[in-house]
Every structure is written in structure tokens, then in C-alpha cells.
């Protein structure tokens, strides 16, 4: 149950969850955002705070459907960072994420990674971020312990969403037969 998430995060000695990637075909992101349509987003779940969703400027209306605190990537222009890094894409993106994390007060502790991103570039970004923010330790949840435990029970709103999706699925199957 999402309302138990803060307790589950704390019990697992984690300071934040970082869910990254598109909202579609990304079970961890969909669990938190619902069926919104964003092509790329970064969601940070920090105990004691409203979740924070970073999103593309053109996707702000979809992002707003989550009810989370929203920050557009446009607040962190890559063109300026690329100038500072002499065109180094990795360094510029790492600086961008460093500023994003600093702005949400996430500069130390353990951050559990979830989501669906291209592995190589994301791994390189995480390594670079660990150098820029030595107080943060990023780690993967190999068994999906935290999110699976949260998903194990449902509150009324989550049950209603499941029922709604079941009705949609049933209606589509009837039309196809």
C-alpha cells in the first residue's frame, strides 16, 4: 500500500527512491504515476516529503495528473552545462542531476534505484554522480523488496484503479472477439 511506503523505506534503511524512465512499459514508474503519458521522467520519493517528479516541459500537463510536486527539466538547461564541460555530454548530464538532487535536498544517504532506462548511459551517469555527490550511495534493489512490499496490499484508491483497468481490458477483449 502506498501509504505504508514511508515505513517500508525507513525499515530498509533507505533515504530515498529514484524511479526513472518513461511512464509506459515501466512497472515501477506506473505504480507511482498511474497511466500518464510521459516519455522520460525522474521521480524521487523521500520519506516525509511529497514525491517530486522531474519531467519534460512539453509533458507538464500529463505530469500534473500525478498530484506530485513537479519540476521541469528546463530549469536545468543542458546548453549552459555543455559549455561549462566543453561539450562533454556525460559531465553535463551529471552536473544537471547534481543540481536537481541538491534542489530537492537529496545530497547524502542511500538512494534505491528503480525504473527502466538504457543501462550503459544510466550506469555511467550514476558513477559520475557518486563522484560529484560523495555523500550519496546509489544502489539497486535486486529483489524489488521495497516496491513489492508496498504493492502487496491495496487501499481503496488502488483497488478502484485495478477494477477500472479490469473493466477497460474486458471491454477491449469483447470488441476483439
Residue locations for each model-derived region?
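Flexible, acidic/His-enriched mid-domain "rim/lid" segments that flank
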Residues: 91-177
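N-terminal accessory/capping or targeting/presequence segment of soluble
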Residues: 1-99, 167
Amino acid at each position: 500500500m502506498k501509504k505504508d511506503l514511508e515505513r517500508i523505506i525507513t525499515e530498509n534503511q533507505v533515504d530515498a527512491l529514484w524511479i526513472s524512465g518513461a511512464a509506459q512499459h515501466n512497472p515501477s514508474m506506473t505504480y507511482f504515476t498511474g497511466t500518464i503519458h510521459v516519455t522520460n521522467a525522474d521521480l524521487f520519493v523521500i520519506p516525509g516529503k511529497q514525491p517530486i517528479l522531474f519531467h519534460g516541459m512539453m509533458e507538464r500537463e500529463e505530469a500534473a495528473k500525478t498530484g506530485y510536486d513537479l519540476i521541469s527539466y528546463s530549469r536545468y538547461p543542458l546548453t549552459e552545462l555543455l559549455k561549462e564541460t566543453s561539450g562533454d555530454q556525460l559531465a553535463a548530464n551529471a552536473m544537471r542531476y547534481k543540481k536537481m538532487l541538491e534542489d530537492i535536498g537529496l545530497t547524502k544517504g542511500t538512494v534505491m534505484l528503480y525504473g527502466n532506462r538504457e543501462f550503459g548511459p544510466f550506469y555511467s551517469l550514476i558513477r559520475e554522480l557518486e563522484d560529484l555527490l560523495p555523500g550519496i550511495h546509489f544502489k539497486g534493489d535486486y529483489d524489488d523488496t521495497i516496491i513489492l512490499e508496498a504493492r502487496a496490499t491495496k487501499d481503496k484508491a488502488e483497488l478502484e484503479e485495478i477494477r477500472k483497468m479490469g473493466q477497460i481490458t474486458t471491454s477491449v477483449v469483447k470488441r476483439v472477439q
